[in-house]
Amino acid sequence: MHRALIVVDVQNDFCEGGSLAVTGGADVAAAITDLVGQTAGTSYRHVVATRDHHVDPGEHFAPAGEEPDYVSSWPVHCVAGTEGVGFHPNFAPAVASGAIDAVFDKGAYSAAYSGFEGLDENGETLAEWLRSRDVTEVDVVGIATDHCVRATALDAAREGFRTHVLLDLTAGVAEETTDRALEELRTAGVRLTGKPVVA
């Protein structure tokens, strides 16, 4: 019975300067790298990362010339082969260190918010990967608190993992949606500690 850290979508397009930037994302990326450096292999048996990785996600992107509604349609972001899809430079030391055991890409041809919708390079889901390594407890960090962190943590709990969100290591898009997400997570039995960065 082991514990894993799930790092959600710490990517260029979700940090300052990106096409769907979340204020505080770059600082959160650096803080997550510090956590990974201090705890990989000790507090956490495994560290995994998720990544938005869009090829042609259909209506997930707002049509050219139209404003996205920021609920079901979004600006173009994290397109495969672009700089925006890459992990943020502040997270690069964690990746370069070899501490990230697997990366789960999601959303190639449709909208995907939860890391549990993604697949690793071998086509394995996050739930399968964690179970095959006897992981029973997960801590979730990353971007954005009110979207992909929320969805990943809810799915982790639904999949039967004891789930904890380290809110100090998350960045939310807006206060209202973040508050709503936190209430939803509490109701689902997800343990929450700290306070998210919110613009």
Whereabouts are the PLM-identified features?
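Short glycine-enriched, charge-decorated loop/helix-capping segments at active-site entrances
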Residues: G18-G25, E117-L119
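Active-site alpha/beta core segments
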Residues: A30-E137
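Short, glycine/acidic-enriched loop or turn micro-motifs at the edges of active sites
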Residues: N12, V55, A171
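A short glycine-rich beta-strand->turn/loop micro-motif centered on a GG-aromatic cluster
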Residues: D139-G142, F161-E175
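Extreme N-terminal starter segment of soluble prokaryotic enzymes
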Residues: M1-L5
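Active-site flanking residues adjacent to catalytic metal/cofactor-binding acidic residues
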Residues: V8, R51, L167
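Short acidic-hydrophobic, aromatic-tinged amphipathic segments that line or gate anion-handling sites
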Residues: R191-A199
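Histidine-anchored nucleotide/phosphate-binding helix
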Residues: T39, H147-R158
